Protein backbone atom coordinates (compact mmCIF):
# COMPACT_ATOMS: atom_id res chain seq x y z
CA UNK A 1 0.00 0.00 0.00
CA UNK A 2 2.83 2.38 0.84
CA UNK A 3 4.53 1.55 -2.44
CA UNK A 4 1.31 2.33 -4.34
CA UNK A 5 0.92 5.60 -2.47
CA UNK A 6 4.55 6.54 -3.13
CA UNK A 7 4.21 5.71 -6.84
CA UNK A 8 0.99 7.71 -7.11
CA UNK A 9 2.52 10.73 -5.42
CA UNK A 10 5.59 10.61 -7.71
CA UNK A 11 3.39 10.32 -10.79
CA UNK A 12 1.19 13.24 -9.72
CA UNK A 13 4.25 15.36 -9.03
CA UNK A 14 5.73 14.57 -12.45
CA UNK A 15 2.35 15.18 -14.06
CA UNK A 16 2.08 18.57 -12.42
CA UNK A 17 5.61 19.40 -13.53
CA UNK A 18 4.78 18.39 -17.10
CA UNK A 19 1.50 20.31 -17.29
CA UNK A 20 2.44 23.53 -15.50
CA UNK A 21 5.94 24.40 -14.22
CA UNK A 22 5.54 25.62 -10.64
CA UNK A 23 8.00 28.51 -10.65
CA UNK A 24 10.67 29.97 -12.92
CA UNK A 25 13.43 28.66 -10.66
CA UNK A 26 16.25 26.61 -12.12
CA UNK A 27 15.30 23.46 -10.21
CA UNK A 28 11.71 23.48 -11.47
CA UNK A 29 12.90 24.28 -14.99
CA UNK A 30 15.33 21.35 -14.95
CA UNK A 31 12.56 19.03 -13.69
CA UNK A 32 10.22 20.31 -16.38
CA UNK A 33 12.92 19.87 -19.05
CA UNK A 34 13.67 16.33 -17.88
CA UNK A 35 10.01 15.28 -18.00
CA UNK A 36 9.57 16.83 -21.46
CA UNK A 37 12.70 15.10 -22.75
CA UNK A 38 11.45 11.78 -21.40
CA UNK A 39 8.05 12.21 -23.09
CA UNK A 40 9.78 13.23 -26.32
CA UNK A 41 12.00 10.15 -26.14
CA UNK A 42 8.99 7.88 -25.70
CA UNK A 43 7.19 9.56 -28.60
CA UNK A 44 10.16 9.27 -30.96
CA UNK A 45 10.70 5.64 -29.91
CA UNK A 46 7.04 4.86 -30.58
CA UNK A 47 7.28 6.52 -33.99
CA UNK A 48 10.45 4.64 -34.93
CA UNK A 49 8.93 1.32 -33.79
CA UNK A 50 5.76 1.93 -35.81
CA UNK A 51 7.68 2.97 -38.93
CA UNK A 52 10.70 0.69 -38.73
CA UNK A 53 10.79 0.30 -42.54
CA UNK A 54 11.71 3.98 -42.96
CA UNK A 55 13.95 4.08 -39.92
CA UNK A 56 16.15 7.15 -40.34
CA UNK A 57 19.73 7.28 -39.10
CA UNK A 58 20.52 7.92 -35.47
CA UNK A 59 21.59 11.51 -36.16
CA UNK A 60 18.20 12.36 -37.67
CA UNK A 61 16.37 10.68 -34.80
CA UNK A 62 18.45 12.67 -32.33
CA UNK A 63 17.61 15.88 -34.18
CA UNK A 64 13.89 15.05 -34.14
CA UNK A 65 14.11 14.25 -30.43
CA UNK A 66 15.81 17.56 -29.64
CA UNK A 67 13.28 19.55 -31.69
CA UNK A 68 10.42 17.73 -29.94
CA UNK A 69 11.97 18.54 -26.55
CA UNK A 70 12.13 22.24 -27.44
CA UNK A 71 8.51 22.28 -28.60
CA UNK A 72 7.30 20.48 -25.48
CA UNK A 73 9.19 22.82 -23.16
CA UNK A 74 7.96 25.98 -24.86
CA UNK A 75 4.38 25.15 -25.86
CA UNK A 76 1.56 23.99 -23.63
CA UNK A 77 -0.51 23.06 -26.68
CA UNK A 78 2.33 20.86 -27.97
CA UNK A 79 2.49 19.00 -24.64
CA UNK A 80 -1.26 18.43 -24.74
CA UNK A 81 -1.23 17.51 -28.44
CA UNK A 82 1.40 14.80 -28.13
CA UNK A 83 -0.42 13.09 -25.25
CA UNK A 84 -3.73 13.21 -27.12
CA UNK A 85 -2.02 11.75 -30.20
CA UNK A 86 -0.69 8.83 -28.15
CA UNK A 87 -4.17 8.21 -26.70
CA UNK A 88 -5.67 8.41 -30.20
CA UNK A 89 -3.51 5.44 -31.19
CA UNK A 90 -5.83 3.30 -29.08
CA UNK A 91 -9.00 4.58 -30.74
CA UNK A 92 -10.10 4.31 -34.37
CA UNK A 93 -6.73 5.35 -35.71
CA UNK A 94 -4.97 2.57 -33.84
CA UNK A 95 -7.67 0.15 -34.97
CA UNK A 96 -7.06 1.04 -38.62
CA UNK A 97 -3.31 0.58 -38.21
CA UNK A 98 -3.79 -2.85 -36.61
CA UNK A 99 -6.24 -3.89 -39.35
CA UNK A 100 -3.67 -2.89 -41.98
CA UNK A 101 -1.03 -4.95 -40.18
CA UNK A 102 -3.37 -7.95 -40.00
CA UNK A 103 -4.15 -7.70 -43.71
CA UNK A 104 -0.44 -7.66 -44.48
CA UNK A 105 0.08 -10.78 -42.34
CA UNK A 106 -2.73 -12.60 -44.18
CA UNK A 107 -1.41 -11.68 -47.61
CA UNK A 108 2.16 -12.59 -46.76
CA UNK A 109 1.02 -15.81 -45.10
CA UNK A 110 -1.99 -17.37 -46.82
CA UNK A 111 -1.83 -15.78 -50.27
CA UNK A 112 1.86 -16.56 -50.68
CA UNK A 113 1.21 -20.10 -49.43
CA UNK A 114 -1.60 -20.53 -52.00
CA UNK A 115 0.80 -19.56 -54.80
CA UNK A 116 3.43 -21.91 -53.36
CA UNK A 117 1.00 -24.87 -53.37
CA UNK A 118 -0.11 -24.05 -56.93
CA UNK A 119 3.51 -24.00 -58.02
CA UNK A 120 4.16 -27.34 -56.32
CA UNK A 121 1.13 -28.85 -58.06
CA UNK A 122 2.36 -27.57 -61.43
CA UNK A 123 5.87 -28.94 -60.82
CA UNK A 124 4.35 -32.30 -59.89
CA UNK A 125 2.31 -32.47 -63.10
CA UNK A 126 5.25 -31.58 -65.34
CA UNK A 127 7.54 -33.98 -63.47
CA UNK A 128 5.06 -36.83 -63.90
CA UNK A 129 4.55 -36.08 -67.60
CA UNK A 130 8.29 -36.08 -68.16
CA UNK A 131 8.73 -39.33 -66.24
CA UNK A 132 5.83 -41.04 -68.03
CA UNK A 133 7.11 -39.99 -71.43
CA UNK A 134 10.31 -41.92 -70.75
CA UNK A 135 8.73 -44.86 -68.92
CA UNK A 136 6.19 -45.43 -71.70
CA UNK A 137 8.20 -44.76 -74.86
CA UNK A 138 11.51 -46.41 -74.12
CA UNK A 139 10.32 -49.77 -72.69
CA UNK A 140 7.79 -50.07 -75.49
CA UNK A 141 10.29 -49.26 -78.22
CA UNK A 142 12.85 -51.52 -76.62
CA UNK A 143 10.43 -54.45 -76.74
CA UNK A 144 9.53 -53.54 -80.30
CA UNK A 145 13.20 -53.58 -81.28
CA UNK A 146 13.69 -56.94 -79.61
CA UNK A 147 10.71 -58.31 -81.54
CA UNK A 148 12.11 -57.11 -84.87
CA UNK A 149 15.49 -58.60 -84.09
CA UNK A 150 13.82 -61.86 -83.08
CA UNK A 151 11.94 -61.96 -86.41
CA UNK A 152 15.15 -61.24 -88.24
CA UNK A 153 16.84 -64.12 -86.45
CA UNK A 154 14.11 -66.51 -87.60
CA UNK A 155 14.54 -65.59 -91.25
CA UNK A 156 16.47 -68.14 -93.38
CA UNK A 157 19.13 -66.52 -95.58
CA UNK A 158 19.27 -67.35 -99.31
CA UNK A 159 22.37 -69.30 -100.40
CA UNK A 160 22.00 -69.22 -104.20
CA UNK A 161 25.43 -67.83 -105.03
CA UNK A 162 27.52 -69.04 -102.13
CA UNK A 163 30.22 -70.29 -104.50
CA UNK A 164 30.51 -66.99 -106.33
CA UNK A 165 29.68 -64.29 -103.78
CA UNK A 166 29.87 -64.19 -100.02
CA UNK A 167 28.42 -61.39 -97.82
CA UNK A 168 27.39 -60.70 -94.26
CA UNK A 169 24.05 -59.05 -93.51
CA UNK A 170 23.22 -57.25 -90.31
CA UNK A 171 20.06 -55.55 -89.08
CA UNK A 172 20.44 -52.14 -87.53
CA UNK A 173 17.32 -50.68 -85.89
CA UNK A 174 17.36 -47.00 -84.94
CA UNK A 175 14.69 -45.45 -82.76
CA UNK A 176 13.26 -42.02 -83.02
CA UNK A 177 11.16 -40.79 -80.12
CA UNK A 178 9.41 -37.41 -79.87
CA UNK A 179 10.21 -37.26 -76.15
CA UNK A 180 12.83 -34.55 -76.62
CA UNK A 181 10.37 -32.32 -78.43
CA UNK A 182 7.74 -33.09 -75.79
CA UNK A 183 10.17 -32.26 -73.00
CA UNK A 184 11.13 -29.00 -74.67
CA UNK A 185 7.47 -28.09 -75.09
CA UNK A 186 6.76 -28.94 -71.44
CA UNK A 187 9.71 -26.87 -70.29
CA UNK A 188 8.47 -23.91 -72.31
CA UNK A 189 4.95 -24.29 -70.91
CA UNK A 190 6.27 -24.70 -67.37
CA UNK A 191 8.44 -21.62 -67.78
CA UNK A 192 5.50 -19.55 -68.98
CA UNK A 193 3.23 -20.68 -66.12
CA UNK A 194 5.95 -20.19 -63.52
CA UNK A 195 6.66 -16.77 -64.98
CA UNK A 196 3.00 -15.81 -64.57
CA UNK A 197 2.94 -17.16 -61.00
CA UNK A 198 6.19 -15.38 -60.15
CA UNK A 199 4.82 -12.16 -61.61
CA UNK A 200 1.64 -12.55 -59.54
CA UNK A 201 3.61 -13.25 -56.35
CA UNK A 202 5.97 -10.32 -56.91
CA UNK A 203 3.08 -7.99 -57.75
CA UNK A 204 1.13 -9.12 -54.69
CA UNK A 205 4.13 -8.66 -52.39
CA UNK A 206 4.90 -5.26 -53.91
CA UNK A 207 1.32 -4.05 -53.63
CA UNK A 208 1.09 -5.40 -50.08
CA UNK A 209 4.33 -3.75 -49.03
CA UNK A 210 3.47 -0.42 -50.64
CA UNK A 211 -0.12 -0.61 -49.40
CA UNK A 212 0.98 -1.40 -45.86
CA UNK A 213 3.38 1.53 -45.85
CA UNK A 214 0.79 3.88 -47.34
CA UNK A 215 -1.80 2.72 -44.82
CA UNK A 216 0.67 3.26 -41.98
CA UNK A 217 1.44 6.78 -43.22
CA UNK A 218 -2.28 7.44 -43.72
CA UNK A 219 -2.90 6.17 -40.17
CA UNK A 220 -0.26 8.55 -38.79
CA UNK A 221 -1.73 11.43 -40.78
CA UNK A 222 -5.21 10.51 -39.58
CA UNK A 223 -4.01 10.48 -35.96
CA UNK A 224 -2.45 13.92 -36.30
CA UNK A 225 -5.45 15.41 -38.13
CA UNK A 226 -8.02 13.91 -35.74
CA UNK A 227 -6.04 15.10 -32.72
CA UNK A 228 -5.82 18.59 -34.20
CA UNK A 229 -9.58 18.63 -34.87
CA UNK A 230 -10.24 17.41 -31.33
CA UNK A 231 -8.22 20.25 -29.85
CA UNK A 232 -9.85 22.73 -32.22
CA UNK A 233 -13.34 21.66 -31.16
CA UNK A 234 -12.38 21.49 -27.50
CA UNK A 235 -10.85 24.98 -27.49
CA UNK A 236 -13.28 26.49 -30.00
CA UNK A 237 -16.04 29.03 -29.32
CA UNK A 238 -18.50 26.23 -28.45
CA UNK A 239 -15.95 23.97 -26.82
CA UNK A 240 -18.01 23.63 -23.64
CA UNK A 241 -20.59 21.62 -25.63
CA UNK A 242 -18.17 19.17 -27.26
CA UNK A 243 -18.32 15.71 -25.62
CA UNK A 244 -19.61 17.30 -22.42
CA UNK A 245 -21.20 14.19 -20.93
CA UNK A 246 -18.60 13.35 -18.26
CA UNK A 247 -19.06 14.00 -14.54
CA UNK A 248 -15.55 14.65 -13.21
CA UNK A 249 -14.29 15.23 -9.68
CA UNK A 250 -14.22 18.96 -10.33
CA UNK A 251 -17.90 18.79 -11.31
CA UNK A 252 -18.67 17.00 -8.03
CA UNK A 253 -16.82 19.70 -6.07
CA UNK A 254 -18.66 22.42 -7.96
CA UNK A 255 -22.00 20.78 -7.18
CA UNK A 256 -21.10 20.43 -3.48
CA UNK A 257 -20.13 24.08 -3.44
CA UNK A 258 -23.52 24.98 -4.91
CA UNK A 259 -25.23 22.87 -2.26
CA UNK A 260 -23.34 24.59 0.58
CA UNK A 261 -24.40 27.95 -0.83
CA UNK A 262 -28.06 26.86 -0.78
CA UNK A 263 -28.27 26.79 -4.56
CA UNK A 264 -29.82 24.10 -6.77
CA UNK A 265 -27.66 21.01 -7.20
CA UNK A 266 -27.88 18.10 -9.62
CA UNK A 267 -26.15 15.22 -7.83
CA UNK A 268 -27.00 12.42 -7.48
CA UNK A 269 -28.17 11.79 -11.03
CA UNK A 270 -31.48 10.10 -11.67
CA UNK A 271 -31.89 6.89 -13.64
CA UNK A 272 -32.47 8.60 -16.97
CA UNK A 273 -29.46 10.89 -16.54
CA UNK A 274 -27.17 8.00 -15.60
CA UNK A 275 -27.87 6.45 -18.99
CA UNK A 276 -26.62 9.55 -20.78
CA UNK A 277 -23.91 10.99 -18.54
CA UNK A 278 -20.80 9.14 -17.35
CA UNK A 279 -19.22 9.52 -13.94
CA UNK A 280 -15.45 9.52 -14.49
CA UNK A 281 -13.77 7.08 -14.06
CA UNK A 282 -16.35 4.47 -15.06
CA UNK A 283 -16.41 1.31 -17.15
CA UNK A 284 -20.17 1.42 -17.58
CA UNK A 285 -21.18 2.22 -21.15
CA UNK A 286 -23.94 4.60 -22.09
CA UNK A 287 -26.24 3.77 -25.05
CA UNK A 288 -24.25 6.20 -27.19
CA UNK A 289 -20.98 4.56 -26.19
CA UNK A 290 -22.44 1.11 -26.92
CA UNK A 291 -23.36 2.30 -30.40
CA UNK A 292 -19.86 3.69 -30.84
CA UNK A 293 -18.42 0.38 -29.65
CA UNK A 294 -20.48 -1.47 -32.27
CA UNK A 295 -19.23 0.88 -34.98
CA UNK A 296 -15.69 0.30 -33.70
CA UNK A 297 -15.95 -3.48 -34.15
CA UNK A 298 -17.83 -3.38 -37.50
CA UNK A 299 -14.68 -2.95 -39.68
CA UNK A 300 -12.90 -5.51 -37.52
CA UNK A 301 -15.58 -8.12 -38.24
CA UNK A 302 -15.52 -7.26 -41.95
CA UNK A 303 -11.78 -7.74 -42.24
CA UNK A 304 -11.94 -10.84 -40.03
CA UNK A 305 -14.39 -12.37 -42.53
CA UNK A 306 -11.92 -11.63 -45.34
CA UNK A 307 -9.03 -13.13 -43.36
CA UNK A 308 -11.01 -16.29 -42.62
CA UNK A 309 -11.95 -16.54 -46.31
CA UNK A 310 -8.28 -16.49 -47.37
CA UNK A 311 -7.43 -19.02 -44.66
CA UNK A 312 -10.29 -21.29 -45.80
CA UNK A 313 -9.11 -21.18 -49.44
CA UNK A 314 -5.56 -21.99 -48.34
CA UNK A 315 -6.73 -24.87 -46.13
CA UNK A 316 -9.06 -26.32 -48.80
CA UNK A 317 -6.26 -26.25 -51.37
CA UNK A 318 -3.97 -27.97 -48.87
CA UNK A 319 -6.58 -30.67 -48.20
CA UNK A 320 -7.20 -31.13 -51.93
CA UNK A 321 -3.52 -31.67 -52.70
CA UNK A 322 -3.11 -33.96 -49.67
CA UNK A 323 -6.03 -36.14 -50.78
CA UNK A 324 -4.57 -36.23 -54.30
CA UNK A 325 -1.29 -37.46 -52.83
CA UNK A 326 -3.05 -40.34 -51.08
CA UNK A 327 -4.94 -41.27 -54.24
CA UNK A 328 -1.80 -41.15 -56.37
CA UNK A 329 0.10 -43.35 -53.93
CA UNK A 330 -2.71 -45.93 -53.85
CA UNK A 331 -3.04 -46.23 -57.64
CA UNK A 332 -2.01 -49.71 -58.89
CA UNK A 333 0.63 -50.08 -61.56
CA UNK A 334 -0.30 -50.62 -65.19
CA UNK A 335 0.95 -53.85 -66.80
CA UNK A 336 1.60 -53.55 -70.55
CA UNK A 337 1.83 -56.67 -72.75
CA UNK A 338 3.49 -56.62 -76.18
CA UNK A 339 2.38 -59.65 -78.19
CA UNK A 340 3.64 -60.59 -81.65
CA UNK A 341 1.17 -62.70 -83.59
CA UNK A 342 2.09 -64.78 -86.59
CA UNK A 343 0.49 -67.21 -89.02
CA UNK A 344 2.09 -70.51 -89.85
CA UNK A 345 0.45 -73.02 -92.17
CA UNK A 346 -2.93 -71.33 -91.76
CA UNK A 347 -2.77 -71.24 -87.95
CA UNK A 348 -2.54 -67.94 -86.08
CA UNK A 349 -0.90 -67.68 -82.70
CA UNK A 350 1.30 -65.67 -80.41
CA UNK A 351 4.87 -66.20 -81.42
CA UNK A 352 6.45 -63.68 -79.03
CA UNK A 353 5.20 -62.13 -75.77
CA UNK A 354 6.86 -59.58 -73.50
CA UNK A 355 5.45 -57.48 -70.65
CA UNK A 356 6.54 -54.56 -68.49
CA UNK A 357 4.96 -52.50 -65.70
CA UNK A 358 4.34 -48.76 -65.68
CA UNK A 359 3.41 -46.87 -62.51
CA UNK A 360 0.54 -44.43 -62.94
CA UNK A 361 2.28 -41.72 -60.91
CA UNK A 362 5.93 -41.37 -60.09
CA UNK A 363 6.57 -41.39 -56.31
CA UNK A 364 9.27 -38.75 -56.72
CA UNK A 365 6.77 -36.41 -58.42
CA UNK A 366 4.10 -36.45 -55.70
CA UNK A 367 3.36 -32.85 -54.61
CA UNK A 368 4.09 -31.87 -51.02
CA UNK A 369 1.73 -29.07 -49.92
CA UNK A 370 2.49 -26.63 -47.14
CA UNK A 371 0.13 -25.16 -44.55
CA UNK A 372 1.09 -21.98 -42.69
CA UNK A 373 -1.69 -21.68 -40.12
CA UNK A 374 0.54 -21.29 -37.07
CA UNK A 375 2.81 -18.79 -38.81
CA UNK A 376 -0.16 -16.62 -39.76
CA UNK A 377 -2.77 -16.96 -37.04
CA UNK A 378 -0.45 -16.54 -34.07
CA UNK A 379 0.26 -12.87 -34.95
CA UNK A 380 -3.35 -12.48 -36.11
CA UNK A 381 -4.58 -13.72 -32.72
CA UNK A 382 -2.38 -11.15 -31.00
CA UNK A 383 -3.74 -8.42 -33.31
CA UNK A 384 -7.35 -9.51 -32.70
CA UNK A 385 -6.80 -9.63 -28.93
CA UNK A 386 -5.32 -6.14 -29.04
CA UNK A 387 -8.28 -4.90 -31.09
CA UNK A 388 -10.74 -6.38 -28.59
CA UNK A 389 -8.91 -4.75 -25.66
CA UNK A 390 -8.78 -1.40 -27.48
CA UNK A 391 -12.46 -1.66 -28.34
CA UNK A 392 -13.46 -2.38 -24.74
CA UNK A 393 -11.22 0.42 -23.46
CA UNK A 394 -12.21 2.94 -26.14
CA UNK A 395 -14.65 4.68 -23.78
CA UNK A 396 -11.96 4.84 -21.08
CA UNK A 397 -9.48 6.31 -23.57
CA UNK A 398 -12.00 8.97 -24.51
CA UNK A 399 -12.39 9.82 -20.83
CA UNK A 400 -8.62 10.09 -20.56
CA UNK A 401 -8.53 12.45 -23.55
CA UNK A 402 -11.07 14.71 -21.85
CA UNK A 403 -9.19 14.58 -18.53
CA UNK A 404 -5.87 15.37 -20.22
CA UNK A 405 -7.40 18.29 -22.10
CA UNK A 406 -9.04 19.84 -19.05
CA UNK A 407 -5.78 19.44 -17.10
CA UNK A 408 -4.03 21.76 -19.54
CA UNK A 409 -6.94 24.20 -19.87
CA UNK A 410 -8.65 24.71 -16.48
CA UNK A 411 -10.55 27.75 -17.76
CA UNK A 412 -12.27 25.63 -20.41
CA UNK A 413 -12.97 23.05 -17.72
CA UNK A 414 -14.81 25.61 -15.58
CA UNK A 415 -16.89 26.68 -18.57
CA UNK A 416 -17.76 23.05 -19.33
CA UNK A 417 -18.75 22.39 -15.71
CA UNK A 418 -20.96 25.48 -15.51
CA UNK A 419 -22.60 24.68 -18.85
CA UNK A 420 -23.28 21.03 -17.93
CA UNK A 421 -24.61 22.02 -14.50
CA UNK A 422 -26.96 24.58 -16.02
CA UNK A 423 -28.05 22.11 -18.68
CA UNK A 424 -28.96 19.48 -16.09
CA UNK A 425 -30.89 22.04 -14.02
CA UNK A 426 -32.77 23.19 -17.10
CA UNK A 427 -33.75 19.65 -17.99
CA UNK A 428 -34.87 18.92 -14.44
CA UNK A 429 -37.00 22.06 -14.39
CA UNK A 430 -39.02 20.60 -17.25
CA UNK A 431 -39.45 17.18 -15.65
CA UNK A 432 -42.53 17.94 -13.42
CA UNK A 433 -44.58 18.94 -16.45
CA UNK A 434 -43.63 15.75 -18.18
CA UNK A 435 -44.46 13.70 -15.11
CA UNK A 436 -47.90 15.37 -14.84
CA UNK A 437 -48.54 14.58 -18.46
CA UNK A 438 -47.41 11.04 -17.87
CA UNK A 439 -49.77 10.26 -14.92
CA UNK A 440 -52.81 9.35 -17.05
CA UNK A 441 -50.69 7.00 -19.08
CA UNK A 442 -49.58 5.30 -15.87
CA UNK A 443 -53.21 5.07 -14.74
CA UNK A 444 -54.14 3.44 -18.01
CA UNK A 445 -51.52 0.77 -17.37
CA UNK A 446 -53.23 -0.43 -14.16
CA UNK A 447 -55.17 -3.68 -14.40
CA UNK A 448 -58.26 -2.54 -12.43
CA UNK A 449 -58.88 0.24 -14.95
CA UNK A 450 -59.59 -2.34 -17.65
CA UNK A 451 -61.05 -5.01 -15.33
CA UNK A 452 -63.01 -3.25 -12.53
CA UNK A 453 -64.56 -6.57 -11.48
CA UNK A 454 -61.23 -7.61 -10.01
CA UNK A 455 -61.21 -4.50 -7.82
CA UNK A 456 -64.75 -5.21 -6.55
CA UNK A 457 -63.80 -8.79 -5.63
CA UNK A 458 -60.77 -7.52 -3.74
CA UNK A 459 -62.94 -5.08 -1.75
CA UNK A 460 -65.40 -7.85 -0.79
CA UNK A 461 -62.51 -9.98 0.48
CA UNK A 462 -61.08 -7.19 2.64
CA UNK A 463 -64.42 -6.13 4.30
CA UNK A 464 -65.07 -9.46 6.20
CA UNK A 465 -61.49 -9.50 7.37
CA UNK A 466 -61.93 -6.05 8.91
CA UNK A 467 -65.17 -7.17 10.65
CA UNK A 468 -63.40 -10.16 12.22
CA UNK A 469 -60.77 -7.85 13.61
CA UNK A 470 -63.46 -5.77 15.25
From Swiss-Prot:
Q: Which stretches are transmembrane?
A: 34-54, 56-76, 98-118, 210-230, 293-313, 377-397
Induction summary: Up-regulated by IL4/interleukin-4, macrophage colony-stimulating factor (M-CSF), receptor activator of NF-KB ligand (RANKL), lipopolysaccharide (LPS) and toll-like receptor (TLR). Up-regulated by TNFSF11-induced osteoclast differentiation in combination with TNF-alpha. Down-regulated upon dendritic cell (DC) maturation.
Q: What does this protein do?
A: Probable cell surface receptor that plays several roles in cellular fusion, cell differentiation, bone and immune homeostasis. Plays a role in TNFSF11-mediated osteoclastogenesis. Cooperates with OCSTAMP in modulating cell-cell fusion in both osteoclasts and foreign body giant cells (FBGCs). Participates in osteoclast bone resorption. Involved in inducing the expression of tartrate-resistant acid phosphatase in osteoclast precursors. Plays a role in haematopoietic stem cell differentiation of bone marrow cells toward the myeloid lineage. Inhibits the development of neutrophilic granulocytes.
Keyword hit for Iron: no
Q: How does it assemble?
A: Interacts with CREB3. Monomer. Homodimer. Isoform 1 interacts (via the C-terminus cytoplasmic tail) with OS9 isoform 1 (via the C-terminus tail); the interaction induces DCSTAMP redistribution to the endoplasmic reticulum-Golgi intermediate compartment. Isoform 1 interacts (via the C-terminus cytoplasmic tail) with OS9 isoform 2 (via the C-terminus tail).
PTM note says: Glycosylated.
Extracellular topological domain = 55, 119-209, 314-376
Q: What is this protein called?
A: Dendritic cell-specific transmembrane protein
- Predominant place of localization: membrane
**What is the gene called?**
Dcstamp
* GO BP, sorted A to Z: cellular response to interleukin-4; cellular response to macrophage colony-stimulating factor stimulus; cellular response to tumor necrosis factor; membrane fusion; myeloid dendritic cell differentiation; negative regulation of cell growth; osteoclast differentiation; osteoclast fusion
Q: Does the keyword rRNA-binding apply?
A: no
Gene Ontology cellular component annotations, sorted alphabetically? cell surface; endoplasmic reticulum membrane; endoplasmic reticulum-Golgi intermediate compartment membrane; endosome membrane; membrane; plasma membrane
* Record keywords: Cell membrane, Differentiation, Endoplasmic reticulum, Endosome, Immunity, Membrane, Transmembrane, Transmembrane helix
Task: Write out the domain note.
Answer: Several domains are necessary for interacting with OS9. The region in the cytoplasmic tail that is necessary for interaction with OS9, is also required for its transport.
InterPro entries in UniProt:
CSR-E3_Ligase_Protein, DC_STAMP-like
Following inactivation of the gene, the phenotype reported is: Mice show a lack of osteoclast and foreign body giant cells multi-nuclear formation and a bone-resorbing efficiency reduction. Mice show increased bone mass. Older (>12 months) mice suffered from multisystemic inflammations in the kidney, lung and salivary gland. Mice show autoimmune symptoms, like dendritic cells (DC) with increased phagocytotic activity and antigen presentation.
Q: Where in the cell is it found?
A: Cell membrane; Endoplasmic reticulum membrane; Endoplasmic reticulum-Golgi intermediate compartment membrane; Endosome
What does the tissue specificity note say? Expressed in macrophages and bone marrow dendritic cells (BM-DC). Weakly expressed in the spleen and lymph node. Highly expressed in multi-nuclear osteoclasts compared to mono-nuclear macrophages. Expressed in foreign body giant cells (FBGCs). Isoform 1 and isoform 2 are expressed in osteoclasts.
> Which Pfam family, just one, is annotated for this protein?
DC_STAMP
Report the membrane topology from the UniProt record.
Multi-pass membrane protein
Segments on the Cytoplasmic face: 1-33, 77-97, 231-292, 398-470
Q: Which species is listed as the source? A: Mus musculus (Mouse)
Amino acid sequence: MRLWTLGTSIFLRLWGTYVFPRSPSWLDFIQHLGVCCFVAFLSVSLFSAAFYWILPPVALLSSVWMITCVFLCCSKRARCFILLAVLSCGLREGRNALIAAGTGVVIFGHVENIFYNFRGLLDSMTCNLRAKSFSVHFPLLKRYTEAIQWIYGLATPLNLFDDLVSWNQTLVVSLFSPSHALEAHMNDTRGEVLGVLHHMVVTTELLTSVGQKLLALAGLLLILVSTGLFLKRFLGPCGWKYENVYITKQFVRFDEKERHQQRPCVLPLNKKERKKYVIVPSLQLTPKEKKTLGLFFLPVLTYLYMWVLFAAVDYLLYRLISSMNKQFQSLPGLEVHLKLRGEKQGTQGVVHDSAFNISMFEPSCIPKPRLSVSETWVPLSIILLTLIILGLLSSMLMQLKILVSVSFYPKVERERIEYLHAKLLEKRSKQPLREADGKPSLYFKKIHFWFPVLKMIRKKQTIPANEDDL
